[in-house]
Amino acid sequence: MASRKEALARRANRVRRHIKSVANGRPRLSVHRSSKNIYAQIIDDVAGKTLASASTLDKDLRGSLKTGADTAAAAAVGKLVAERASKAGVTDVVFDRGAFIYHGRIKALAEAAREGGLTF
């Protein structure tokens, strides 16, 4: 039986393998969720560079959020990463949820990023 970390890595690799097959050169919006914070970055896999990033630890958000571990914080990160992506000239991305299910904070971030102008 696989350990928790091995199962997490297996799920993340399965999602990323699917993303690479459908990306067609589009950058990916990668999301990571910890127990206290949430992080999002837009990565160009062809060039190997991060085009935009945002998290609940950013100075822009830290003072305005009560906590980094709720859906309101995730939505704020989604809007911020969409705003930074538009400044970088990115509008079309592939959503990389990693091993996290599309529910709760991950879903709130994705919907806020869509409202902010990203399409996926």
UniProtKB/Swiss-Prot annotation:
InterPro entries: Ribosomal_uL18_bac-type, Ribosomal_uL18_bac/euk. GO terms for cellular component: cytosolic large ribosomal subunit. It comes from the Bacteria. One of its GO terms (biological process) is translation. CDD domains: Ribosomal_L18_L5e. SUPFAM superfamilies: Translational machinery components. GO terms for molecular function: 5S rRNA binding; structural constituent of ribosome. Keywords: Ribonucleoprotein, Ribosomal protein, RNA-binding, rRNA-binding. PANTHER family: 39S RIBOSOMAL PROTEIN L18, MITOCHONDRIAL (PTHR12899), LARGE RIBOSOMAL SUBUNIT PROTEIN UL18M (PTHR12899:SF3). Part of the 50S ribosomal subunit; part of the 5S rRNA/L5/L18/L25 subcomplex. Contacts the 5S and 23S rRNAs. This is one of the proteins that bind and probably mediate the attachment of the 5S RNA into the large ribosomal subunit, where it forms part of the central protuberance. Belongs to the universal ribosomal protein uL18 family. This is Large ribosomal subunit protein uL18. The lineage of its organism: Bacteria, Pseudomonadati, Pseudomonadota, Alphaproteobacteria, Hyphomicrobiales.
